[in-house]
Amino acid sequence: INSKSSKENNKAWISRYALIDDYHKIINKKLKSLMEIIKLDYCEDINYKIYVDTGPLLERAYSYQSGLGWFGKNSCLINKDLGSWFFISEVLINKKLEYDQPVKDMCGSCTKCIDSCPTGAIVDNKKIDANKCISYLTIENKDTIPSNFLKKIGNNIYGCDICQEVCPWNNKKAKIKNNFNWNLRDFFVSPELDKILQLIETQWDEVKIKSPIKRAKKRGFLRNILIAMGNSKNSYYKPKVQKYLKSDDKILATTAKQAILLMES
């Protein structure tokens, strides 16, 4: 997915992984097919359980221990060939296998991810302060966005990829065959703010089907769009924001007020 964060103030930004169908289900289906082939053709007595960020498994830690990559300063797992643009999944089996050893950290003295984080969410020892992370604030946080982060949210309406986009390991194109049908949703790629607002207002129930965006819920998505409109400084959006001042939803009403202040500041 060749999508870069848009700098245009009339465009919104949605994290890359949310531009496609829910990866949990896609990968789970692929792994199940793979294991059934192995079971049928190679090892009848194999038992397995699949995880795609779907259970209490320390995926990143196990991936590191198995040599898939090293932890970058932004805490993402980085592979020397793939960068950090990949999903992690696991298959637990009742067989012993040989496995690779952990690889060395190859970030060196680079601090691009730390320097580029708008909210300063990347702290020491490759840890993230979730309360400052734009991905957390726009997806997991169900309340209003803290006032000290409003401007820093920018035009991010679902997630944030900044610390990965600036990573030098993500600059090269991975040479890997991709036979997954991810079903790219073009209307999520740098959408115009007024169009994505209308889409979420009128077609949320259809848009959220098979999409990870449902995790933010409709209210969260609308909240994020209002903030992005405020940060655009574009008075064209003012009437669209103002109508939410009278919303029965206190979070949206408060956010609309915040967005107007952002627009006028």
Task: Please report, for each region that a protein language model flagged, where it lies by residue.
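Glycine-rich phosphate/pyrophosphate-binding loop
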Residues: 186-221
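Amphipathic alpha-helical scaffolding segments comprising HEAT/armadillo-like alpha-solenoid repeats
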Residues: 203-207, 234-245, 265
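Auxiliary alpha/beta "docking" domains used to position bulky ligands
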Residues: 1-106
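Short, charged low-complexity linear segments at domain edges
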Residues: 78-102, 130-149, 200-205
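C-terminal amphipathic alpha-helical segment
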Residues: 146-181, 206-214, 220-221, 227
